[in-house]
């Protein structure tokens, strides 16, 4: 594994040093997320879509590369944990691991993840297998969090919102950087990127390498003597490249490829000698942008997403000391997701915009471990929206759209949304969005055929939701701060779960079950500049998420609070970022018992940066995550006693106090 680390390190170094050096300073004034209206994006129709949605009444948060670097975040999960209001995201056992997610009271499976507009969600399974455990933070230009029902433009699973991870962008001037560092969990990190003109176009290339021995994932007294894998280690590597050619001011072609691979331990408290997944992932895209006139622009994009993993688990045999039970030996599971997206924007008259689009997705996957048969599914979708601009209605923007989804397996889904934004003047505004969204059944729910467990159902209906998001905001008098009060409401029906039991085969069978998931909540946030040298943000979110009047749904926090401050004196060669993350009551019911609250904790992080030279090409970053070494659980699971076989509660631990240091050379 060390040889892989050094090979990726060499690749990163080549990317960063191989281009001619020139001055390029790293932005430092950014400590967290910001509203998308404040972000200037120079691109074509797809890249500008979040900005257009924000003007129509959709709430969009943005996390920038500067905020990620200043916070010393290692992966995508860490980058979002402390920065985005209303977003709960908890890795199982530290960086590059599975995560539980809740956006404004949602379930994990209600959030759609994309990279450069390509869907990442693992449609083998609905929840718990988020597609984030091999994605490093260093490759990010920005992360866009689009809240509310986003099925109109983004399709399945965007019930509570969509998160688009934008990788390093193009530049007209050659620049880049190389970073190396480590932390007190015996971790090593190296990343680099270079970008600029090349031949007739522009290029971007980036690479990242992370390796760690990790930390103890459970309390020591919750391990069984039979388990000898006591630290959860990982190694994760990424290589990516983009190339763009502008054939004319009206025609642009962009191609990209990213390869992620790694070895990720899977922590288990009993029996395990070693358990891990070997990940491999490729995301290949090609996109053509055409600006035909001032009243018509469009894009066509093809993508191929290949995700494969091999799971290995060797267990100790308590009945034969020194003996090994082979549970899984490089057993494959994975999927291929490929398709075409096309969208056009028309301006038929002043003050009116029309969007028309088509999506095609072909998906197939299989799992040898949990026995999901290999099947293929295709989905065709048509969508359209009409919106106004303030040129037509002063200070008011309205939008309405509809989407029709036709999968080859399962039943069709039609959804629609309406939204509005009114600017009162003086920076005060009112936003509202209402609509519905859907989640298509997963491969497990459609095609599973495990003779000892479960069976899928090809006749499932999609889960469907009704949503309402409303917010009111404005400036704080006398300072450069802005506040926003948000209400969110969501009902989800046609729930997919085990519905019947087949006594002949002994299998649970999936079906659409009665009941409704109801989410009701509110959020208040404030952000901006306290002084020219101090910026910050703070937020509080309350979520009630229940099913049919029952208790709070497991793994969805009742309350969240986040705060951050960034000190960036422009005349001094340093900066400091501090953040607070509070998770309120959050429940789980492991080991066959009743609900257990494993929340109510606060984690503090602090980081500092020192610029060595006047041009700010060289910087040293130090950080302290979990400053007070708070011992907290990110999830609860079930273990089994070696002697009796009885189940017991296991606490998955969050990252302990960790000191990090990095050096960056920019050019």
Where are these regions (language model features)?
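N-terminal periplasmic "start-of-domain" segments of outer-membrane beta-barrel proteins
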Residues: 38-71, 100
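Extracytoplasmic beta-strand/coil segments of soluble accessory domains associated
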Residues: 52, 77-119, 141
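Short acidic/polar hinge/loop motifs at secondary-structure boundaries
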Residues: 100-102, 119-147
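Conserved C-terminal beta-signal and adjacent last beta-strands/turns
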Residues: 195-198, 206, 245-246, 432-433, ...
